[in-house]
């Protein structure tokens, strides 16, 4: 017996120790933190949640620069009072504007438009910096609330689409819209409170359940197509898809030197060409040569292949590897794929990038709400629009992300949905107080879910990155679009799996599902896809509902003759129309 024990001792002492990460996962999983976030129950680990949060943040980090850029186009709180007097001779500085024939010209409302007054331009730049920090702060707080209260791997930030509506339709370019920036924030604030109220009483969840099953299922695939479409474009993707005047979209991938912008213009009788009233100049979206010679496109393709190959081989962190590789290559200057071209804008971006650490304090947008325009019709028009878009858009996104993560049960519910709705609504209120447009659950959360994120620790990890972004915004704001495009496309691929749950043999389900999916990318709106899907579902079922109502009222008698072998429903021919 002693010899056997002695023989067994070497085997126990030479047994390899668990790896450091495994020991860390075991320790955290059994700790109060692990139990609080249900790591073991949801078959996840601490390091998996960290990796998922990292992937989610990297795919949505573009919002830091993009949201601030869009909202600052409204002019924010800047006004004519920020414009400075200019000399009648533009070549002379105002301080030296003395002498015969020279005078200081006091600014008027035209100082906000081209050529923009230097004082107003400086104010807008301060607003942009304020909005970067406001975006970070609102996103950070929203992610913390979602992670702690709902325990879901969902990240929040100011939503794309609603920010454009806020800036260009409600407030208008440099304040040329129907209501002021301050009043628009008040509309978002009140809308957030209404949203919070209907979420608190559980009415929002009931509204969500009213969405027909085929629309709920297909919305996940529709959002996937939407993401892929974004990833294929030039502004936020690899640039494979561009504008065509004859077919709307076409194959692009041309270099920046071969792209042009478009603008709605009007030609007068004397041949003068001017911008159409209310029109705006687009980005460089149209290729003038049909050759795929864009270096950034091919670098994006390399990133796509890296991520795709890692996914095929089930390599963890696939999204991160692709983003980091493309971004690192793009940070080298004086190359064909640089994120910092030798232009004034490129020089400014590179100078900002070289700061690495930059802390900015919000000076203008925080608490800038004004309720003075609450009695105007445009105010309530904006409020109602924000509300219905948030109800349809964010609710659809929440359910799609929950379904993608496998949380939704047979009844259409998922764990933590009450607090998820509350977190989302709370973030809208907080965002308005900081000065930004409505905050919502980001569809890029699907990237982290794909990396294995299943608990609120993923959202908390994203919040930590947003906290770091307070100090490292120059680095994170320098992630190029062609680095973000590949993961968006591949997440779209993975989100298409929900279409297998649709009964394509039943046209009453197939048509609404298809309408939902196709409208989301082609109208650039999740909300419009849901509206189209629900509308087509109602139209296709209206006749059956009418007959059912007449049967219940006794005007028609039902005679069951045969049963549909496919779905077991009573056919229209089975109803006796005899009164």
Swiss-Prot record:
Major place of residence: membrane
Transmembrane segment boundaries: 52-72, 131-151, 183-203, 221-241, 260-280, 292-312, 320-340, 379-399, 414-434, 459-479, 480-500, 514-534
A GO MF label: purine nucleobase transmembrane transporter activity
Any one annotated GO CC term: cytosol
Topology term for the membrane: Multi-pass membrane protein
Phenotype of the disrupted gene, per the record: Resistance to 8-azaadenine and 8-azaguanine but not to other toxic nucleobase analogs. Deficiency in the uptake of adenine and guanine.
Keywords: Membrane, Transmembrane, Transmembrane helix, Transport
Keyword Transport applies: yes
GO biological process: adenine transport; guanine transport; purine nucleobase transport
Location in the cell: Membrane
Family indicated by similarity: Belongs to the nucleobase:cation symporter-2 (NCS2) (TC 2.A.40) family. Azg-like subfamily.
Primary role: Transports natural purines (adenine and guanine) as well as purine analogs. Confers sensitivity to 8-azaadenine and 8-azaguanine (8-azg).
Protein name from the UniProt record: Adenine/guanine permease AZG1
Source organism of the structure: Arabidopsis thaliana (Mouse-ear cress)
Gene: AZG1
